[in-house]
C-alpha cells in the first residue's frame, strides 16, 4: 500500500505565556502571580513541547498534554486575553492568523492532534497485518479529531480554525484511507471478490465526498485534488475488476465483460504510479473474457450493471476516547480564586443581608411599631430619654456625610461620562481622518451603550438619594431640639400591660441585633471557595439556597411573634375599653388639651420625627455604600474599556498611517 496522504501540522509563533499569565493573574484574581510560578512554567513547557513535536507517539503525547493544560486554563482565565498566531500549511502559500482566544488555540491543537495521527498512520504502514490495523485506527482517529473541530468551531467567537468544507474533505480523506487499509487487509486474507468489491466501492464514495468538499474549500491545493481524483478512478477500476471476478464465479460472462470494460475505462483515468501494472492486468483479463464469451459462452453483454452496495467498515473515532481529560492530581492553579468568584461572594452576602432584613429584622421592627402605636393613648410615653447635644451633632454630621457621599458619587459619575465622551470623540476623529471604510473598529456608539445605560441608571439612583437626603434634612430641622434635649421628668408607668409590652419590645430589639451579628459572622465565602476548587464552575445558586436554611429558626420566631402581637394588641384594646378612666390610660379627647397633654404629644411627635431621621440615616448610609461600590465598579469597567479601545485605535491608526506612506 502506498500513495497515501498525511496532513501537515499547523505551525505557530511562540507566546510569552509566563508574562501573559502573570499579568492575567495579577489583574483577575486576589492572589499574585508569584504564588503560581511552578504552574506557569508547566504551561510554558507544555506549549513549547507542542508547537513543533516529533512525528512520534511522544510528539502525540506532547500535543495531548498541552490540550489538557488548555482545558484547565479555560476554567481559570478569561477566554479572550492572550493572542495566539498559527499558520495553515495545506495550501501552497502559508498564511498566518492571530486570535485572542483560548478556545481557538484548543481547537487548533485538536486539529494538530488529527494531523499527528495521519502522520503516524503513514509511518506505521508497512503492509504487515498489525501495521495495517494500526494505520486504519490512526486514520479513523485523525478523522475523529477533524470532525470534533468541525462540530465545535461553530461556537467560536473568532474565525474558524479551518473552513468547514476543508475539514469535511480532510475527514472524508482520512476515512477513505482507513477503509483502504481495511480493503488491503481483506485482499491479503483472500476474502471473496464480491466483499472486496464492496469495500473498494466505499473507498470510492469517500474519495468522491473528499473531492467535492475540497473543491468547495479554501485550502486544499490542486495537486492534492488531482491525487484524490486519481485515487477515486483507481478504486473504481478495482471495484469493477473485483466484481468481474465475482461474476466469473457465477458464470455471468456477459457481466464479466461489461465490468472489465468499466474497470479499464476508470483505470485509464487514474494517474497513480501503480496504474500501469494494474492496467495490464485489466486489459489482459478483458481480452480473455471477450474471446471466451464470443467463441464459447455467447452471453449478451449488458449496457449497464447493477449498482454495487458499499461495505462501510470505518468511522471517525469518538473524541471522548481520543482526547484526555483533567486528572485530579495534575490540576493547575487549583488555589487560584478569580475576582469573579469573590464578586459572587459579595453579591451573595448582599442578598443574604437583604434576606435577613426582609424576612426577620424588618418584620420584627414592624411588629414593634404596631405595638408602640397601640399605646398612643397612654398618658406616659415609654422609652423616651433625653437626647444629648453630642447625639444631635452626630445626626447632623451623618446628614453632612450623606451630602458629601452624594457629591463624591456625582464627581465619579461625571468622570465616567467624560471618559466615555472622550473615547467616542477620539474614535470619531480617527474615523474622519482615515475614512469610514478604512477605520474598521466598531463605532463607539455600538460598544459603549451598556456603559451609558449603567451610568444613566446610577444617576437615577443618585437623584433619588438626593431627594431623600433633602427630605431627611428638612425633617431633622423641623424637630424641636430644645424639647427632646431637655430632661424628661415623668413618673414611671404603673400599668402592668404597658411594662409587659415595653419588655417584649426590648427583647425583640435585642433579637434583631443578635440576628444581624449572626448574619455578619455566617458568610458563604468558605462554601463558594470549596465548591469552586472542586468543580471549577460558578454555579453557586444551589449552595446559596442551602446556606439560607441557617435562618429557618429565625423565620419560625418571626411567625410566633406575629401571633403574640395580635394577642397583645387585643389586650390593649380591651384594657382601653374596660378601663377608660384608670390611672395610666386615658381615651383621646376631642376637647381642649391641657398643657401636660400638649407637652406629651409634642414630645411623642418630635421623637417620632427623630426615629424617622435615624431610619433614613441608616438606610442612606447603606444606600451610598452600595452606590459607591457600583460606581467604582462601573468606573473600573469603563477604564478597562477605554484602555482596550485606546490600544486598538493606536494599532489601527499606526497601521493605516503606515499604509498611506
Curated annotation (Swiss-Prot):
GO terms for cellular component: cytoplasm; endosome; nucleus; peroxisome. GO terms for biological process: invasive growth in response to glucose limitation; protein processing; sporulation resulting in formation of a cellular spore. Residues 388-422 form a coiled coil. It is found in: Cytoplasm; Nucleus. Residues 3-371 form the BRO1 domain. The keyword Coiled coil applies. The modification N-acetylserine is found at residue 2. Pfam families: ALIX_LYPXL_bnd, BRO1. CDD domains: BRO1_ScRim20-like, V_Alix_like. It comes from the Eukaryota. InterPro entries: ALIX_V_dom, BRO1_dom, BRO1_sf. Keywords: Acetylation, Coiled coil, Cytoplasm, Nucleus. Interacts with SNF7 with its BRO1 domain. Interacts with RIM101 with its C-terminal domain, probably binding to its two YPX[LI] motifs. Present with 2881 molecules/cell in log phase SD medium. This is pH-response regulator protein palA/RIM20. It comes from Saccharomyces cerevisiae (strain ATCC 204508 / S288c) (Baker's yeast). The lineage of its organism: Eukaryota, Fungi, Dikarya, Ascomycota, Saccharomycotina. The gene is RIM20.
